[in-house]
Structure formats: structure tokens, C-alpha cells
Amino acid sequence: MANINFGFEHHARKLYSGAIEQGITGSLVPMVIETSGRGERAFDIFSRLLRERIIFLGSGIDEHVAGLIMAQLIFLESEDPERDIYIYVNSPGGSVSAGLGIYDTMQYIRPDVSTVCVGMAASMGAFLLASGTKGKRASLPHSRIMIHQPSGGAQGQESDIIIQAREIEKIRRLLEEILASHTGKDVQQVREDSERDRWMNAQEALEYGIIDQIFEKRPKPDKEKES
């Protein structure tokens, strides 16, 4: 079967492997200590962010990462189906099937999902960035966003390769239709624009319809404004 990816899967795997070697996924994850009447509790930084309904997608997208993101989305919906969920995206892309699993979950749950690009959102990362709730998709000013067509490897007999090529074309068409629906672009325009890597800065992504706003700074609390 074809191994279809929507982005730098090899690069994403290298990033993840490097993180493991450096201990980033384990011992180097920052811990947050909170003190209450019951004593002290320690949270890893990502668990603490989850309490604020913030999900951080900071790696390549594979089945394991997708499973974690989907589980967090469903959990946060069960906690409060009315409050927004925030996904911060800094991803080089990855597996199409994994990314579509995240996408479908984002559309399925009741809360609005706000997406924010921090650093880079490439290929499936850009796809998920654009898939947030309309009006609630944003980027920091110096982030980079990239769209392109899916890639895949095929092997076996000629008939098998033909079947796999047809499947890749179906997936490509599906992704183009979804991206067009979220950006307001024509499907043919999306196909032409994603024929090769198309990199955008935050302003260009705003004009393309991938995001709705650019965050420069957080607004100051009302008390600070008054002083």
C-alpha cells in the first residue's frame, strides 16, 4: 500500500528522534509546581497547558502524535463542550491519515477550535492551521506557512503501482477540496498553488485565507491599561 504523506515525514522523524536522544520528550520537559491547601502538585508543562484548554502540536504528525491530539480534544470537549480549545501549531507536517484523523476530530467536537501558528506550519501543519474555526485562526508575525501536494512511495507490480497512484490522486483531490473550503479559494487555484512548495509569511497566509489575524502582542489587562 502507498505510504502517503503530506509533508516532510523524513524530516519530521529526524526531529522526533533527535528530541528523544536529547531527552526533550522526557526528563527535560519543564515541570510546574502548584501549591494549594492540599499541598504541592507537580505538572509537566503540557499537562498544565491542557488545564487551560491549550494543546501544543510541536512535532511531526504521525499516528502516535495524532492519537494524543485527538484524545486531548475529546477530553476537553467532555470537560466543557462550550469553551474554546486552542491548538498551537509548530509542525513540519507528516502523515496524511494521521492529520485527517485530527482534522475530523476538530470538526466533530462541539467547542470552537482556535489555531495559532508559532514558528512553522508546513504541509499537514498548514492544513490543520487552516482548519480551525473561521475567525479564530491566527499566526505570530514571523511564522512561516507552507502548502504543497501530498507525496507517496509505491512499490510492487505495475498494477499495484497504478492502484496506489490513483489513491494518491484521490487523497490529493480531497485535501484540495477541504483546504479550498476553509480558505475560500477555488479548488483549481489551490491545486495550482500547491503544485510545488509554496511558502508564505504571516501576512501572505492572512491574504490567502489560511489564517484570520496576526498576533503581535497580547492585549494588556484592563488594570494595567488604567494605570
From Swiss-Prot:
Active-site feature positions: S123, H148
GO biological processes: protein quality control for misfolded or incompletely synthesized proteins
Gene Ontology terms: cellular component: cytoplasm; endopeptidase Clp complex
Top-level EC class as recorded in UniProt: hydrolase
Alphabetized GO MF terms: ATP-dependent peptidase activity; ATPase binding; serine-type endopeptidase activity
Lineage: Bacteria, Pseudomonadati, Chlorobiota, Chlorobiia, Chlorobiales
Reaction catalyzed: Hydrolysis of proteins to small peptides in the presence of ATP and magnesium. alpha-casein is the usual test substrate. In the absence of ATP, only oligopeptides shorter than five residues are hydrolyzed (such as succinyl-Leu-Tyr-|-NHMec, and Leu-Tyr-Leu-|-Tyr-Trp, in which cleavage of the -Tyr-|-Leu- and -Tyr-|-Trp bonds also occurs)
Protein name (database record): ATP-dependent Clp protease proteolytic subunit
General function of this protein: Cleaves peptides in various proteins in a process that requires ATP hydrolysis. Has a chymotrypsin-like activity. Plays a major role in the degradation of misfolded proteins.
Keywords attached to this entry: Cytoplasm, Hydrolase, Protease, Serine protease
Subcellular localization: Cytoplasm
The enzyme's E.C. designation: 3.4.21.92
Subunit architecture: Fourteen ClpP subunits assemble into 2 heptameric rings which stack back to back to give a disk-like structure with a central cavity, resembling the structure of eukaryotic proteasomes.
Family the entry assigns: Belongs to the peptidase S14 family.
